[in-house]
Regions:
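Hydrophobic/aromatic residues within well-ordered alpha-helical segments
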Residues: 16, 59, 66, 70-74, ...
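Hydrophobic alpha-helical connector segments
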Residues: 65, 78-108, 157-167, 191
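Short helix-capping/turn signature of helix-turn-helix
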Residues: 56, 101-102, 115-121
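Amphipathic alpha-helical segments enriched in hydrophobic/aromatic and basic residues
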Residues: 28, 37-38, 49, 59, ...
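Hydrophobic/aromatic-rich alpha-helical bundle segments in the mid-to-C-terminal region
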Residues: 126-130, 148-205
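Amphipathic alpha-helical packing segments from all-alpha helical-bundle domains
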Residues: 80, 103-110, 123-150, 192
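Short hydrophobic/aromatic patch on the recognition helix
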Residues: 45-56
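Basic, helix-initiating cap at the start of DNA-binding domains
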Residues: 1-31, 35-44, 61
Length: 205
């Protein structure tokens, strides 16, 4: 059944929502969660502070919505790449390319770090935080690992899970360090390191 086109009001709301998320990413990365002000986010988006509250309940709600949106974008990108693969070997290659390409985005690791610090300090948001973490890990579910590596016994699955868990922090650490060592850790250098890390973790699997 064809999707009904959005009317002008819905399109405007959608545009505002997108602009607020984009502005929020800039402010949260630059100022951190604690330092970020909704008024600054509204100004960066070219909207009023009231518009922020029309779309999000609070700064926390906006922050988590941003993280969920960006996480979903990355998961969708990976899934789309894997759908084009005809074999497990091709899927591993596609995942490797996806992982190395993470070096292009210098804001996502900082945002991820902010999110993890937020999670440590806000136990009252436990349920939503847990769901966000599960979504962040959803690219490492059983279907994904079986697509790449075939049937796994318990020991093999445990090894894969540890390797997958290590990938994200390694990217975050390298990109964070690149702000202090830009000549040593250029994007090209980081891509090279990430490729080596991936091969070390998965080639022998």
């Amino acid at each position: 059944m064809p999707t009904k086109p959005l009317n002008k009001h819905q399109l405007k709301n959608q545009e505002t929502h997108t602009r607020l998320l984009k502005a929020a990413e800039e402010i949260f990365v630059h100022d951190g969660y604690q330092g970020a002000q909704l008024s600054a986010i509204a100004a960066a988006a070219g909207r009023t502070k009231g518009a922020v509250y029309d779309h999000f309940k609070s700064k926390e709600d906006l922050f988590l919505a941003l993280f969920e949106t960006r996480t979903r974008e990355y998961i969708d990108d990976l899934v789309n790449r894997l759908k084009k693969c005809a074999s497990g070997e091709q899927s591993v290659d596609a995942f490797r390319e996806f992982y190395v390409d993470l070096a292009r985005d210098k804001t996502w690791p900082i945002l991820t770090l902010e999110f993890k610090l937020f999670a440590l300090r806000h136990a009252e948001s436990k349920d939503r935080l847990r769901k966000a973490f599960l979504m962040m890990k959803s690219s490492g579910d059983e279907d994904f690992t079986q697509r790449m590596f075939g049937p796994l016994n318990r020991r093999q699955k445990s090894t894969i899970e540890r390797s997958l868990a290590a990938l994200g922090p390694i990217v975050s650490g390298l990109i964070l360090e690149s702000y202090f060592e830009p000549e040593i850790l250029s994007e090209k250098s980081i891509r090279r390191v990430l490729a080596g890390v991936f091969d070390a973790l998965f080639t022998a699997t």
